Amino acid sequence: MACPYLGSGELTHRVTFMEGGEECQQGVNKVEMGFGQTYSEYLQLDKILTAQRLKSEADGQRVDDEHLFIVIHQAHELWFKQIIFDLDNVRKLLNNTIVDETKTLKIVSGLDRMTKILSLLTEQITLLDTMSPLDFVDFRKYLTPASGFQSLQFRVLENKLGVRQERRIKYNAQHYKNVFNDTDLKTLNVTEEEKSLLTLIESWLERTPGLKSTSEDEGFWIKYEKSVNKYLADLAKQAADPSNTEEIAKQLTAEYHKTADAFQSILDPRQHEQHIRNGNRLLSHDATKGAMMIYFYRDMPRFSQPYQILTFLMDIDSLFTKWRYNHVLLVQRMLGAKQGTGGSSGYMYLRSTVSDRYKVFLDLFNLSTWLIPREYIPMLSPRMVKTLSEHSNLSHSQSSESD
């Protein structure tokens, strides 16, 4: 049977036949013709595939698992490079006084790819569990003083995301930069000085449309405060219901006061600022209000992609936490309570990093504290419905064309 992709006409090149005499599609071997570069040349595989040099083998005591150990860590560094590449593109799109809303899909796509890579890494690191602790001991001596703590790209990634220096856990009671040389320190200093993703997201959220009151609309936050007060009043009414037993009344009253205190901490700007100073919150009050508005009205066309952005930011934090946790379990399994190859306290140090201190977008997780039932969510004015139904950049472009 003739291959359907050949079409009519004479055959001028070689044709390969499948088993049974079935023709495959016509093709040309461009390598034989000297056309362009090969797959191996394009990917520079001669460099990549010769970079797995086993120290144990050079010492005449080859340990096969060292090969896996090297490949896993090299693969991590390649993926870190891709995440940083995508992160820089996202930061570039956000680093504008007015973010082009027609570009938010690119931001969403970039963050989506980052989460997929991080998801892959959380699974990839578990491949090291296929080594036995005894096999690891056989080649561990060749690693000293090399340590994953010295991964420049991982620290660059943390800084570009927005991990605050004051929130870092001390490494052997020292600053994290002490393990890097002068060239690497310059790179790290630049990443500490430039705007992180957290800073850019904060500025973007502060400009959420409809957040502030105008002559035409009183704004989201004023309406939200009124709705919260109504919600709290209803909770107080439930607690004071004469039909409640003494025990139920006590529980409902305690719940009311706890809920009221939680809402007061976000409604009062001074309390919010105090939480920032205490290190419990990272986003400004206006940025937090913007995120709240996006949460409540995520079904509006103009907020659908911003809501996805906020979701992916939390996914990034979650996946980093999962990766750190998997790493901790791996180290505990392989080393127990031994000191790390770089001189750290090993398991104990790594376990301390699996905490909210390293969550860049912790405030987004905590937004659920101040969500109110749907029946209390403030209604949007007709003017605001129109505003949130049209992308500002698209509307401006269309009006310019009509002019």
UniProtKB/Swiss-Prot annotation:
Disruption phenotype: RNAi-mediated knockdown of the protein increases longevity and causes a delayed and extended reproductive life span without increasing total progeny. Animals show increased levels of tryptophan, reduced sensitivity to proteotoxic aggregates of alpha-synuclein and reduced age-related decline of motility. A double knockdown of tdo-2 together with an enzyme downstream in the kynurenine pathway, kmo-1, flu-2, afmd-1 or haao-1, causes an increase in motility and tryptophan levels and suppresses the proteotoxicity similarly to knock-down of tdo-2 alone. Expressed in body wall muscle cells, hypodermis, PLM neurons and touch-receptor neurons. A motif (PLD motif) lies at residues 133-135. Heme-dependent dioxygenase that catalyzes the oxidative cleavage of the L-tryptophan (L-Trp) pyrrole ring and converts L-tryptophan to N-formyl-L-kynurenine. Catalyzes the oxidative cleavage of the indole moiety. Involved in regulation of protein homeostasis, longevity and reproducive life span. Specifically regulates proteotoxicity due to age-related aggregation of proteins like alpha-synuclein, via its effects on tryptophan metabolism. Homotetramer. Dimer of dimers. The gene is tdo-2. It catalyses: L-tryptophan + O2 = N-formyl-L-kynurenine. It comes from Caenorhabditis elegans. Transmembrane segments: none annotated. This is Tryptophan 2,3-dioxygenase. One of its GO terms (biological process) is L-tryptophan catabolic process to kynurenine. Pathway: Amino-acid degradation; L-tryptophan degradation via kynurenine pathway; L-kynurenine from L-tryptophan: step 1/2. Substrate binds at F69, I70, V71, I72, H73, R140, T341. It comes from the Eukaryota. Its cofactor is heme.
